[in-house]
A protein has these predicted regions:
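Active-site histidine-anchored catalytic micro-motif
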Residues: 2-169
Length: 169
């Protein structure tokens, strides 16, 4: 694999901070550069923040921004950090854009975390590493990467009862 992996930041649990005074979660800055350094990433990754929002607040206009950035991106390998609550919706929008050739010849991986990186016990670092590996090894298409597994955009759902992603049965 040659070239740079583009890492688009959209917010989600990955980047949430904890307010010790009132117990709320909020966004400050992305942790992605710190995570890449901590994970000793030796792949050329360019980080770009598109937005810092909870995925429950994401709407079609936000998805259009993500889609447009993926379409214009010179890299053929893209990782998108995303909140897990609506990740399938964004994956579907991107997958449909690839199906109708609005986006072509790109491997796009959406990745999230169930626990904020700032908490220390987060699954985010593991998920990010897996997403970067999948971006380099999977054929062009749109995928969701969580917990060491990857799923095609049209065959994934979040199982809220167990807190994991799974294939649609």
């Amino acid at each position: 694999m040659s070239g740079t992996i583009r890492l688009f930041v959209t917010g989600g649990t990955f980047d949430k901070e904890y307010n010790e005074r009132d117990g709320s979660l909020y966004f400050k800055d992305t942790h992605l550069r710190e995570m890449l350094q901590l994970g000793r990433c030796r792949v050329d990754v360019e980080v770009r923040t598109l937005m810092m929002i909870d995925s429950l607040e994401m709407d079609d206009d936000d998805r259009a921004v993500i889609l447009n950035q993926c379409r214009k991106c010179p890299s053929s390998h893209i990782v998108i950090t995303h909140g897990t609550d609506t990740m399938e919706m964004t994956a579907r929008a991107l997958g449909e854009a690839m199906a109708d050739k609005t986006i072509t010849d790109k491997t796009i991986i959406l990745v999230g975390a169930m626990i904020p990186f700032a908490f220390g016990s987060s699954d985010g670092l593991f998920n990010l590493g897996a997403a970067i590996a999948f971006a380099q090894s999977l054929p062009p298409g749109v995928y969701v990467a969580m917990n060491g597994r990857y799923f095609r955009w049209d065959n994934v759902r979040k199982n809220r009862d167990v807190g994991e992603f799974e294939e649609v049965e």
